[in-house]
């Protein structure tokens, strides 16, 4: 839609390929836009079982494709606690240099993190619908099934990624260059 004023893609990461044993989790990336009319649109969903190297590749390729198709898109990745999480976050920051990327340690359980997006999805009691539109696409059925069965569903990856994208949209952060003159009286490093 042409009336989207801000885009964010949230990710939920897993690192188990389809051919490994068991029923592993998915890597999910959900793109949500905030529209001028204060509604939201879920415009794209990626949900795949991938090896760790394939996860990195799909995230990079998705950043490239999102920029081409939608312009500026904030990408939000989860950061695990501890040294390994910091190392992975630094690795992603290097891999995605040139894109707007945040690696954030999630707080609270999955249900608590999903509540703000769920509230917009459902709307006020008595309303016919909430404030979230969904682009018609091949991934709709899988996405709706997971959302409708959350939190009892076996997989919660797309819901987690949706919550992350929504939180990023509503974080109040702006993505513009700093002013030419800072309040410290020193010229901005961005001004040459």
Which residues does each predicted region cover?
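Short, surface-exposed amphipathic charged segments that create phosphate/polyanion-binding patches used
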Residues: 113-124, 148-152
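Small-residue (G/S/T/A) turn/hinge positions that recur once per unit in extracellular repeat modules
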Residues: 130-132
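Conserved helicase motor
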Residues: 107-110
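Short, conserved catalytic or adaptor-binding loops enriched in Gly and charged residues
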Residues: 92-96, 119-127
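RNase H-like, metal-dependent nuclease domains and their acidic two-metal-ion catalytic environment used
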Residues: 1-104, 134-192
């Amino acid at each position: 839609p042409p009336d989207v004023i801000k885009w964010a893609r949230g990710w939920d990461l897993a690192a188990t390929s389809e051919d490994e044993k068991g029923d592993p989790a998915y890597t999910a990336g959900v793109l949500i836009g905030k529209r001028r009319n204060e509604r939201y649109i879920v415009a794209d969903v990626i949900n795949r079982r991938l090896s760790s190297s394939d996860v990195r590749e799909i995230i990079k390729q998705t950043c490239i494709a999102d920029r081409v198709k939608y312009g500026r898109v904030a990408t939000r990745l989860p950061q695990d606690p501890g040294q390994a999480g910091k190392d992975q976050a630094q690795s992603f920051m290097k891999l995605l240099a040139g894109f707007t990327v945040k690696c954030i340690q999630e707080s609270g359980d999955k249900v608590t993190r999903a509540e703000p997006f769920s509230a917009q999805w459902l709307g006020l009691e008595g309303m016919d619908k909430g404030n979230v539109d969904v682009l018609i696409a091949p991934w709709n059925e899988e996405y709706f099934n997971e959302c409708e069965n959350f939190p009892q569903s076996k997989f919660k990856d797309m819901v987690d990624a949706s919550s992350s994208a929504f939180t990023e949209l509503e974080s109040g952060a702006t993505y513009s260059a700093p002013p030419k003159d800072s309040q410290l009286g020193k010229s901005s490093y961005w001004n040459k």
